[in-house]
Structure formats: C-alpha cells, structure tokens
Amino acid sequence: MTKLGKPVTQRQLRVGAMINQALGMLFLRDEAKLPNLSTKEITVTEVRMSPDLKTAKIFVMPLGGKDTEEVVTKLKEFSFVIRKVLSKKIVMKFLPKLFFVKDDSFDYAEKIENLIKQTNK
C-alpha cells in the first residue's frame, strides 16, 4: 500500500525491479566513476516508485553498515551523474528522479530479534 492507501501497481513493481537491477550492476561495475566513493560496496535493497513513475526512492546500505550517512550523502550529491549513466541502460520515456535513502530495515530487524531473544530468556 502507498501513503494514500492505494495498492502498488504491477507496473510500479516492475519498473522498480528494473531500476534496482540496473543500479546494482552499475554500482558493481563502478560505471558511474564517482570520486571518493567505492560503489562496489553499496547494496540497493529496495526501489519504490511513485504512482506516476516520475520519482524513485532508492534504499541503499553499504556493506558492513559503516558510514551509511556519508554514502547516502555522496549518492545524493552525484544523483545526476548516476541518473545519466542509468539512462543509457534503461529505455523509458522518462527516467525517474532518484532519491537515495538509508535503509534502516536491517537495524530494525536486529532490534526485533534482540527483543525476541530477551523474552525467551
């Protein structure tokens, strides 16, 4: 479900998966050539598309979970370059604007796991 209570469409999921895969390969091969950032260590965990497919919220996490804020800040800084390289890989009428966000799901899962372990003791 989206914020407005509307279900996510199949098209949003398909485009999100396509962008997720393309970004993963782009980061793995370091095709964007971003200065001061090793993109081989960045994991794209999820891509959420807006209903009009004009914006993409990209959840990222560096391997090891170190310097997450710094990595997200640099990705935001170079989002134009990443979008330009991505446009050569994905054929769409409009490539969405990319918004990079820190993925907290691993921290949240670890917190819940610790709570479960505490209740079992």
Where are these regions (language model features)?
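Charge-rich, low-complexity N-terminal segments
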Residues: M1-T55, M61-K121
